[in-house]
Amino acid sequence: MSNRINGLPGYPTGQSWSPRKIRRGNQPPIYLDGGVVIDGTNSGDATNTGYPHVLQPGKIMVKAASGGLYRNFIIGKTTAAYVDNDTTLTVGAATATEVARLIAAAGAAVSLALIGPPSAAGTVAATAISVTAASGTTLTIADLNLAKVSDSLIALPAAGYTAGSFCIVDDDDFINLADETNARANQPFPRPLIGGTLDTSQLLDWPADSSTVTYLKGLLNAAGGMSNFRFDDPA
């Protein structure tokens, strides 16, 4: 997205930019024909320090359950294990800020999912959560009556997206979700990646737990879905 350059003549403060490559090998990528539209209000990239309104390559996207727009599937990850009877989740500050923005945009609590096993390499489940507040490094939820490992995914619930509609922001595609007034706005997504060999070290919000990795790969390559990815790791 192009932006008007504001200010007086002269040298402005420099801004850095680093290319990102998420595909491996020389095989041609496969894109969803015709592209799609991203929900600018409900999308963001908490991993992009200082620029959460810009989606980076490696961001996993999915079609919302209603409205036909695409948004990022994973909001962030927990930074501490969740213990039964807790009413909070511990996350990074950027993740808490993004969830707080979603709550403000909705004007109410947001329905999300906490995806992970109760212990390392255990059975993964997507547990529905309602986040009523987010501040600092804390998300406020109700007691879940279960446990989850640290690094569990905070993502859209099953009722919030269309199964089999996953795609990924491709190499060097940095998608600015803000308009000229810095307000969030829907944006074109002309190259939704739905096939190729992926460097998992470059996929944003990629989990560390082996069973969660397997679970997420299953979502990306769901039977009957539109995507068909290969991964460079053996898991």
Segments the model singles out, each with a brief description of its role:
Residues 1-235:
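Surface-exposed, low-hydrophobicity beta-strand/loop segments enriched in small/polar/acidic residues
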